[in-house]
Amino acid sequence: MFGFFKSPGNNKLPNESSNNKGGTITAGRRTSSEPILITPDFDDDDKYKNGFNDSGGLQSQTTEELEKYAVYKAEETTKGVNNCLKIAEDIRSDGARTLEMLHQQGEQINRTHEMAVDMDKDLSRGEKLLNNLGGMFSKPWKPKKTKNITGPMITPDKPSKKSENHKEEREKLGLGAKGRSSSQPALDQPTNALQKVEQEKAKQDDGLSDLSDILGDLKSMAVDMGSEIDKQNKALDHLGDDVDELNSRVQGANQRARHLLSK
């Protein structure tokens, strides 16, 4: 009537494609056939951490949610094993450095005692000279020696036979130190939750095997440290006795020298 009406066949939606030869209409809204970008639900971790306590518990979850939860727990367990392994590796590194420092300390004790032996030789020559300086009419002087200076009791550290046998036994049992395990073949990319869980279990087995090896190494290190400390304690006691003997003889030599100078 007013000239505003058109035939229904000529109506077009605003978003209709101009190149649409099939006559179909493309609506402005998204259709169910178009792909939808799925963004991760950042609340999943919170749900998994509290065991679905806020959503009815495990019994109320779908099979898909339970599969995701199983994968999540498997990955968390793998992370825990890897963290323990990293801590154990750091402890082993610190233990190796400590053991090396102990060996160096033992070598220093050995060198110090060898210097005491050299001092004994020099002191013996000095005592002989002081005795000769008295002259033929003076009373002969003889230094007081309560013990001989025998030198160090320990030698540069060598692996003990017991340690070597222990190492051989561990290697026969397949427990020798070997770092991170690489025995597992490369696994294909998992296609479902079960395969992902099995893959994580394989990683956990490798990590636990490596952790067992490291703990064995730490036990051996602890035994070696204990043996080294015991040897050094005995060596220090022996060195202290020799130093006391040298100190007593030096005091006697000083008294003899002052007596000769007072004449």
Curated annotation (Swiss-Prot):
Q: Where is the composition biased (Polar residues)?
A: 8-34, 52-61, 180-194
- Entry keywords, A to Z: Coiled coil, Cytoplasm, Membrane, Protein transport, Transport
User: What's this protein's family per the entry?
Assistant: Belongs to the SNAP-25 family.
User: Its topology with respect to the membrane?
Assistant: Peripheral membrane protein
Coiled coil start-end: none
Subcellular localization(s) per the UniProt record: Membrane; Cytoplasm
Question: Which PANTHER family does the UniProt record give?
Answer: SNAP25 HOMOLOGOUS PROTEIN SNAP30-RELATED, SYNAPTOSOMAL ASSOCIATED PROTEIN
Recorded GO cellular component terms are:
SNARE complex
Which Gene Ontology terms describe the biological processes this protein takes part in?
membrane fusion; protein transport; vesicle-mediated transport
Highest taxon above the source species: Eukaryota
| Purpose of the protein | Vesicle trafficking protein that functions in the secretory pathway.
Protein name per its UniProtKB record? Putative SNAP25 homologous protein SNAP30
- Note the InterPro entries from the entry: NPSN/SNAP25-like_N_SNARE, T_SNARE_dom
In this chain the t-SNARE coiled-coil homology domain maps to: 198-260
Q: Where is the composition biased (Basic and acidic residues)?
A: 158-173, 197-206
Extent of the signal sequence: none
Q: Name one GO molecular function term.
A: SNAP receptor activity
Keyword Acyltransferase present in the record's keywords: the answer is no
Which intervals of the chain are annotated as region Disordered? 1-61, 132-209
